[in-house]
């Protein structure tokens, strides 16, 4: 069940009110306000203006409100998340009913 939860979270099917983003931000579709949650490895400012400003970098990244924007960050994922994603992909292919 935990693996199914992780797979559904990565696939973006878990939670209909908020779209998960691999950049560590969550955008609420109900209230229309950006609820940005920083990852543990970085410190970010709230996305009041729709942009995420990182303290250790001078660049600003817009908050993603769709799964398409978060799929681009697959290569920047930590290794554990990448392995989990590949495991879930392998599990979806190999989980056909056996005769």
From Swiss-Prot:
It comes from the Eukaryota. It is found in: Membrane. GO terms for cellular component: membrane. The keyword Membrane applies. The chain crosses the membrane at residues 74-90. Present with 1520 molecules/cell in log phase SD medium. It is a single-pass membrane protein. This is Uncharacterized protein YAR064W. It comes from Saccharomyces cerevisiae (strain ATCC 204508 / S288c) (Baker's yeast).
